[in-house]
Amino acid sequence: MCIRDRFDATENLDGFVTISNTLKTCAVNLSKMCNDLRLLSSGPRTGFGEINLPPMQNGSSIMPGKINPVIPEVVTQVAFHVIGNDTTITMAAEAGQMELNAFEPVVFYSLFSSITSMTGAVNTLVKNCILGITANEKRCEDLVSKSVGITTALCPYIGYQKAASIAKKSLKTCLLYTSPSPR
């Protein structure tokens, strides 16, 4: 960071607040992605189950065979930590008085902690989770075959009303979409 006004730099820590806020924004987005991964991998029977995360430890103590999404969970916890550090940095920047802010030590500590934690979390997420994600093809095929959303593709050909009628009938009768037979 280039300091243009050294007097301002001893009074105000807004540059550090900006950096911390950017880290917080990254943490929020990373946490949201991890929550999506947890939801998409939930199961084995009653969740979404559309993707498989690499198993990192023995499953749940209350549900043998279940794979817990431990990597997305730990990354989400790091995001909570970074968000908390951002609050600390914001409060420390605000707590300065007049020409001096005596709370720079906690700002530096929190900022370096956030950077270190986020770096480790991203590396762990990529190495131990993202690179090992696979699609649960059987589950996805099953969901597509039971989806009435596929009738949307019919709208340009038969109109919205007829497509909606087919969708409603499919829901009532549990008729499934199947691929056309090869000829």
Describe each model-derived feature in a short phrase.
Residues M1-D5, Y177-P182:
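Conserved small/polar residues in nucleotide/adenosyl-binding loops
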Residues R4-I89:
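Internal glycine-rich alpha/beta core junctions
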Residues V17, N35, S61, P69, ...:
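Feature representing long, continuous alpha-helical segments
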Residues T22, C26-N29, D36, V78-H81, ...:
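Generic, well-ordered alpha-helical scaffold segments in large soluble proteins
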Residues I51-G59, M91-N101, V144-V148, Y160:
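Short acidic (Asp/Glu) and glycine-rich catalytic loops that position anionic groups and cofactors
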Residues H81-V144:
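Long, amphipathic alpha-helical stalk/connector segments used for oligomerization, subunit docking
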